[in-house]
């Protein structure tokens, strides 16, 4: 199974979701976002957009992905968000998927549901076998 790389804010929603997956993970640190990973991974990222969709991708994630090696090893992205934000729901994952030419594998709301966790576990298992 591959590595999960994630970023989580003070709400801890993304961190909670990732912790339920039972897989190895690496947290992008707000203070040391230029860290490198050395194996293929799936990125799990929340969305922080204003009403116009600006600044959807958290700055530490941008810094992390500015490292060429980190971009090369990303195999997919999973997005967290809040459906109350309508068209901006999980916007960060869509932006990253498009800019980095990787698939957006799944989107979950807030902390995710038990069903989300099951779907992502099964989906990642299948994804890493490809």
UniProtKB/Swiss-Prot annotation:
<protein>
    <recommendedName>
        <fullName>Protein NrdI</fullName>
    </recommendedName>
</protein>
<dbReference type="InterPro" id="IPR029039">
    <property type="entry name" value="Flavoprotein-like_sf"/>
</dbReference>
<dbReference type="GO" id="GO:0036211">
    <property type="term" value="P:protein modification process"/>
</dbReference>
<comment type="function">
    <text>Probably involved in ribonucleotide reductase function.</text>
</comment>
<comment type="similarity">
    <text>Belongs to the NrdI family.</text>
</comment>
<dbReference type="GO" id="GO:0010181">
    <property type="term" value="F:FMN binding"/>
</dbReference>
<dbReference type="InterPro" id="IPR020852">
    <property type="entry name" value="RNR_Ib_NrdI_bac"/>
</dbReference>
<dbReference type="Pfam" id="PF07972">
    <property type="entry name" value="Flavodoxin_NdrI"/>
</dbReference>
<dbReference type="InterPro" id="IPR004465">
    <property type="entry name" value="RNR_NrdI"/>
</dbReference>
């Amino acid at each position: 199974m591959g590595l999960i790389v994630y970023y989580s804010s003070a709400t801890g929603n993304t961190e909670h979701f990732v912790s339920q997956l039972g897989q190895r993970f690496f947290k992008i640190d707000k203070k040391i976002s230029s860290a490198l990973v050395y194996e293929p991974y799936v990125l799990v990222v929340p969305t922080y957009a204003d009403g116009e969709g600006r600044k959807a991708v958290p700055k530490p994630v941008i810094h992390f992905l500015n490292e060429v090696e980190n971009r090369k090893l990303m195999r997919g992205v999973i997005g967290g968000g809040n459906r109350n934000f309508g068209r901006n729901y999980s916007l960060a994952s869509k932006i990253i998927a498009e800019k980095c030419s990787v698939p957006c594998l799944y989107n979950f709301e807030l902390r995710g549901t038990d069903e989300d966790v099951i779907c992502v576990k099964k989906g990642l298992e299948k994804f890493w076998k490809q």
